[in-house]
Curated annotation (Swiss-Prot):
May undergo two steps of processing in its passage through the cell membrane: removal of the N-terminal signal sequence and cleavage of the C-terminal domain. Several active forms of Epr with molecular masses between 40 and 34 kDa were found in the medium of B.subtilis cultures. The size variation of the active forms expressed by the complete epr gene appears to be the result of partial removal of the C-terminus either by processing or degradation. The active site is at residues 142, 172, 326. Requires Ca(2+) for stability. Activity is inhibited by phenylmethylsulfonyl fluoride (PMSF) and EDTA. The lineage of its organism: Bacteria, Bacillati, Bacillota, Bacilli, Bacillales. This is Minor extracellular protease Epr. It is an enzyme of class 3 (hydrolase). Keywords: Cell wall, Hydrolase, Protease, Secreted, Serine protease, Signal, Zymogen.
Length: 645
């Protein structure tokens, strides 16, 4: 913490007690006043715009126009049949009960303030379940939000007339925003929903005061920009029909509104807009879970939350402590964000019902005027323990990087209901799996480099294919390609050598295929020359065999020639030799047919003569035949001949 003499405690007076409502004195003429005119239809709106009134503000989602007008113009507008009603532009103030006390400027990141308020609401259990308010949009309608290292502001809007900036010039809005969403960065404070998208909607001025016109503008902006939750740590003691209509409109559009009950003390009526049924009214509790002395109570109070001595972010990178239902309200708004993250599809009604399951009942049993349904307190669900187990498994996988631990974590994650928390766990595990995949690929490439077998190469290639495109994949593929080239070269050499030895066509074809896979090189050229010699030898052998068969047309020579021709690769030479050999085969076949006819004649003669001489002659003719069905038949006939004695 930055050293301060006598421990600097600066009081910044922000609190303005809730004022008795009346017309604002902003008009230049005492006969003029600021009013909100609510119209029934388009004609009513045109009537307002065409009147003598000065238009201050038009709204996108509210049928109203804020104007400054004299009494006569206001009277005319009230009497117009297309005008629904006219209301005075009344004032609002921030709902603080004490002055802020500045603690530190936060320049020393070792600052880590005590936050008693987190324990009663058990929010750490929600964090363990992965609930951080991620993707939930929260509008803080307040004095704006000041830039702070402990805050992330998603955007904002200024509804006040004196500046277009939504930067906080009071401190109240920044304090509220920190309670909701201060970062979990190891210093300062921890917000209840640190990953919620916080929007600064400036409707209060540097004194913490505002008016109905600006508040309506803030609500209108929240509807237009699809806020999930609106925090209103402000209020007034008088009812407003247009404000009531505005919050109802927002509620119907799916915006959950949370507001401070007020700081007028027990027994005083709940302030507006918290008093409306479409708004969640929040009272404040102290360190002893008792009602804060300043907290307004009433039937409208729905929940209570810590609101005394709350430390949060402040102007100029400082931190400060403050008390009020202003501080209690953001506790509830942030808790709603956690519940909304857990069940994004739930309606406002369902969320309010769900919050009733996440309370500890204080005071009279059931709902009462002081605490409503009770103090908000996160209740762990069965899914929380499942999430915790999955997260623990992911942590183990992150530490060990073992595939068995990765698989176990993935199985546990798969059993979780769909949520941002589940997606976050998946992303963490995907990083571990990516690391593991790279390591596996490196190990398998190294193994392929060592053993240089096709199996190790195939295994390494499969591992590389799992990697995303990038430097690791590119470098590993280069290394594996070198191994592939080595193996391809060795295979080509071995196959060429085998072809040289066997001269078989299958070996020659295999060698040719292996050579074809090699990149152009002197080695490839040399291997091709060696293989071409084998092909030339086979061609010469086939040519000689065919010539021999042509010279002496025997079955044996024809068969030998056919075997030699079969070893040749397809081409003109093989085709020409096969044609020559086919002629030889026809000649051999003709000679064989002649022998068959001769044998048939002699067998027939032996059957007729039945002499030993004719049978011997027939047997000699049959013996000269090639094995065939015809030869078998002739032999059976001859065997049946019994020579005469």
């Amino acid at each position: 913490m930055k050293n301060m003499s006598c421990k600097l405690v600066v009081s910044v007076t922000l609190f303005f007690s809730f004022l008795t409502i009346g017309p604002l004195a902003h008009a230049q003429n005492s006969s003029e006043k600021e009013v909100i005119v609510v119209y029934k239809n388009k004609a009513g709106k045109e009537t307002i715009l065409d009147s003598d009134a000065d238009v201050e503000q038009q709204y996108k989602h509210l049928p109203a126009v804020a104007v400054t007008a004299d009494q006569e113009t206001v009277k005319e507008l009230k009497q117009d049949p297309d005008i629904l009603y006219v209301e005075n532009n009344v004032s609002f103030t921030a709902a603080d009960s004490t002055d802020f006390k500045v603690l530190s400027d936060g320049t020393d990141t070792s600052d880590n303030f005590e936050q008693w308020n987190l324990e009663p609401i058990q929010v750490k259990q929600a964090w363990k379940a992965g609930l951080t308010g991620k993707n939930i949009k929260i509008a803080v309608i307040d004095s704006g939000i000041s830039p702070h290292d402990d805050l992330s502001i998603a955007g904002g809007y200024s509804a006040v007339s004196y500046t277009s900036s939504y930067k906080d010039d009071n401190g109240h809005g920044t304090h509220v925003a920190g309670i909701i969403g201060a970062k979990h960065n190891g210093y300062g404070i921890d917000g209840i929903a640190p990953e919620a998208q916080i929007y600064a909607v400036k409707a209060l001025d540097q004194n913490g005061s505002g008016d109905l016109q600006s508040l309506l503008q803030g609500i209108d902006w929240s509807i237009a920009n699809r806020m999930d939750i609106v925090n209103m740590s402000l209020g007034t003691t008088s009812d407003s029909k247009i404000l009531h209509d505005a919050v109802n409109k927002a509620y119907e559009q799916g915006v959950l509104l949370v507001a401070a009950s007020g700081n007028d003390g027990n027994g005083k009526p709940v302030n507006y807009p918290a008093a409306y049924s479409s708004v969640v009214a929040v009272s404040a509790t102290n360190e002893k879970n008792q009602l804060a002395s300043f907290s307004t109570t009433g039937d409208e109070v729905e929940f209570s939350a810590p609101g005394t001595n709350i430390t949060s972010t402040y102007l100029n990178q400082y931190y400060a402590t403050g008390s009020g239902t202003s501080q209690a309200t953001p506790h509830a708004a942030a808790m709603f964000a956690l519940l909304k993250q857990r069940d994004p599809a739930e309606t406002n009604v369902q969320l309010r019902e769900e919050m009733r399951k996440n309370i500890v009942d204080l005071g009279t049993a059931g709902r009462d005027q002081q605490f409503g349904y009770g103090l908000i307190q996160y209740k762990a669900q069965a899914t929380d323990s499942a999430y915790a187990a999955a997260e623990q498994a992911v942590k183990k996988a992150e530490q060990t990087k073992a595939q068995i631990d990765i698989n176990k974590a993935r199985e546990l994650i798969s059993q979780l209901p769909n949520s941002d928390a589940k997606t976050a766990l998946h992303k963490r595990l995907d990083k571990v799996q990516s690391y593991r995949n790279v390591k596996d690929a490196k190990d398998k490439v190294a193994k392929a480099e060592k053993y240089k077998t096709q199996q190790t190469v195939d295994t390494a290639q499969t591992a590389i294919n799992k990697l995303p495109n990038g430097t690791d994949k590119k470098n590993l593929q280069k290394r594996l390609d070198q191994v592939k080239r080595y193996i391809a070269s060795k295979q080509a050499k071995d196959k060429v050598a085998k072809a040289e030895k066997s001269k078989k066509k299958t070996d020659v074809d295999s060698a040719q295929s292996a050579i074809g896979k090699l990149p152009a090189s002197s080695e490839k050229t040399s291997l091709q020359k060696r293989l071409n010699k084998v092909k030339s030898t086979n061609l010469k052998t086939a040519q000689q065999s065919v010539s021999a068969a042509e010279k002496k047309s025997t079955d044996a020579n024809a068969a030998k020639a056919q075997s030699a021709v079969n070893q040749l690769q397809a081409g003109k030479d093989k085709t020409a030799l096969q044609k020559r050999l086919d002629k030889v085969k026809k000649k051999v076949a003709a000679a064989e047919a002649k022998k068959v006819e001769t044998a048939k004649a002699k067998v027939k003669k032996a059957e007729k003569d039945k002499t030993k001489k004719s049978k011997t002659s027939a047997q000699s003719a049959v013996n000269q035949l090639k094995a065939s069905n015809e030869k078998t038949k002739l032999q059976k006939r001859l065997n049946a001949v019994k020579p005469k004695k």
